[in-house]
């Protein structure tokens, strides 16, 4: 929902004609780079038109220029029924954007020597094993599933865990490894990017096992609180209902989200802008170094360079580093992105690494 306008937002920020990618609005202003006043006026008019045209109940966004929060604003309603307005501080279901924070938490553990990116997942989750038609030695298949491959969607695991017909999906990360053991690989690990929610769920289980803390607690203590992301949580009920947006699917019905905390990040555009600014500052937030510079660089380094079947799709640790099916920015400006669509919600985060610009749009 509303994804078509996210990349043109960055075109506007750059002062290019990228704003023209937002039909049917009037011509965009020819603003100088760094002069955001006219661009913001233009976007405010166009966003309202597009929300009405696409029947979007509520939306919030943030625009970042390096360490500056250029603009953050909410439009429409967080709760249409009770006429509660959306703001830049409203928490939306961020869905797959959680993977950016999970990758960051994994890199933190690697920095402390608590795990290695190239170590097999099975070293941490010893009860977990896979089945493979690609390996004569099944233990070789288990050893091929590393944290690096999990974080870059190259583990070979299927996208989701489909329980047996009369089975139950695990309702906690502690149960997950045993419940999904014996899953068949979809392709050989390290040969192809294939998006896997299951892979990240297992990384979340490994974070719990490695730290001895509940996943939500570890993420709060090591990322959310240090970044002052006060409107963010991996535990939905930790945020008051008044701070959260209602999700609406077709027909205006409320949407629902995942039951596992790794997929249940709630956050606001302003909070996510703090995460982005930390990355732009090479892992530093105010006086605290949350990630080392080399970890941030590793996050943005292509991990799938040798995969012929990935063509021009470049993937870092969590981040998609090239379009991978999305539209290019005008002029071929390089951008990194992550997008999410869950029942009733949409979120999109785009970075321009050379220009140190970012746009966060949540609806």
Where are these regions (language model features)?
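Bacterial N-terminal signal peptides that target proteins for export
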Residues: 1-8
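Short, conserved catalytic-motif segment at the N-terminal edge
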Residues: 33-92, 114-116, 130-131, 181-183, ...
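Short, surface-exposed loop or secondary-structure junction motifs
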Residues: 75-79, 132-343, 347-348
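Catalytic tyrosine of NAD(P)H-dependent dehydrogenase/reductases that use a Tyr as the general acid/base
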Residues: 92-95, 193-195
